Amino acid sequence: MLAARYLAGYPPELIAQAEQLRLDGRLADHLARRLPERHEVRSDSALFAYVQDLKTRHLRNAEPLNFVGYDAKLRVLQHALGTHTRRTQVQGAKLKMRREIRVATLFKEAPAALLRMIVVHELAHLRELEHNKPFYKLCQHMEPDYFQLEFDLRLYLMQQEELK
């Protein structure tokens, strides 16, 4: 049961509905109706500009980002769709903190709302490192439909795996 793997933790009725959509071949149509908008953020520089725009809109006082880009190896190696890293770099007698956000290349072709959701998730890690209540509250502040988009992302991943 593919839905159980991606939707673990959701109510059994919801898992059954998602699995039925998949088995009936209606999952792609359902997602196309829910998430019709596509995006043009295809390059690392466009992604950096997109992330910076969201960051200045919602997290003005957060530390600057040194790198934002797509990462082709991300999903395979770390079983993650996006990462945020903080690395300390020695420059002479000073320590400098580098902050990076990497997004799986899967999102180059994903609907715009799903890209926005993963970027919001990684930006929230600039303030809150752990996945706790303040973290999700911040995500919801930046993207009011965050929890619905997270569920839609899980459905999208199910559909993508089925296409392989």
What are the residue ranges of the model-derived segments?
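Active-site-proximal or metal-binding-adjacent scaffold patches in catalytic folds
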Residues: 1-116, 126-164
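Walker B beta-strand of ABC/ABC-like P-loop ATPase nucleotide-binding domains
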Residues: 119
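Walker B catalytic acidic pair
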Residues: 122
